[in-house]
């Protein structure tokens, strides 16, 4: 029996993941602002202004939707380790930027059409590379 290769609607998958992240954030940290969707909208508007099109535009939109894909993963791990942590005030920027490193590992499992390496990893990095992600990674 011949088995057809699995066809994945990557845009639909990214949208579903984004909605799932919204639900988890609302449940875990009571955040209901749809941050990923706003970042994606602004990113796509800027990309269109810069004449980015096709696969590159689609991949940019997906990265923007999923840029914080590991934030809730990281926060839930911290809460399990330190149950008395005040989630909104008790996590330092340096510690929360670990989600960039976790997110980079998660995102490599998605078959993008263009090179998206480092988009998730460095989304909190400063222009002078003096941010906490580079310091944490090194």
List where the protein language model places each region.
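Histidine- and acidic-residue-rich, metal-dependent catalytic cores
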Residues: 2-138
């Amino acid at each position: 029996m011949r088995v057809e290769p699995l066809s994945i609607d990557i845009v639909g998958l990214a949208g579903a993941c984004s909605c799932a992240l919204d639900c988890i954030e609302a449940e875990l940290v009571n955040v209901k602002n749809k941050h990923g969707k706003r970042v994606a909208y602004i990113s796509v508007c800027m990309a269109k202004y810069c004449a980015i099109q096709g696969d590159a535009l689609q991949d940019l939109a997906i990265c923007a939707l999923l840029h914080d894909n590991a934030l809730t993963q990281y926060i839930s791990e911290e809460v399990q380790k330190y149950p008395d942590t005040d989630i909104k005030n008790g996590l330092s920027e340096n510690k929360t930027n670990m989600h960039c490193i976790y997110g980079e590992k998660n995102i490599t499992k998605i078959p993008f059409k263009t090179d998206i390496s480092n988009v998730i990893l460095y989304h909190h990095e400063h222009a002078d590379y003096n941010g906490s992600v580079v310091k944490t990674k090194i």
